[in-house]
C-alpha cells in the first residue's frame, strides 16, 4: 500500500482530504493514532460512514477542506485529491498558521514536477513557496491500474516534508 512509502507513524494525526468511500482512511487508521476524514459530498459520506463505522480512531468531518480550520496540534496529510483542487489545497496548507509536518498527495505527474526545486524541471511559484518550507520529492510513480477508474494522466505519490 502507498502509505508504506511515507513516514506516517503510530502516534500521528493524519488528515485525509476528500476521503471518498474511505479506502485510504481505513488503511491510514491501521498506521496512525487518529485519522480525520474530510469529505463534503453527501453520497460519498454515506459510503465513508458505512466503511469506517467500526474504526474508533476515525473522525469524519463533512466539510469542504478549503473552508475548514486546520488543527493546532502537529499533523500530517495523506490524500488523493481531485487534480483540479491540488493547487488550492497546497496553498492552504503552506499558508496555514500551523502547516503540516508532512504532506503526501497523489498528484498528476506534470503538476508534481513543477513543485520540485531541481535543475531539470521548471518550478512554479507554488513550487518555490513550497520548497522554502519543505523538502519535496516524488515518492512513488503510480500505474493507471492502481485506480478505479484509471486516470487519463500519469500520477505519482508526492511528498513534502517540513525542513
Regions found by a protein language model. Name each.
Residues 1-163:
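Catalytic cores of RNA-modifying enzymes
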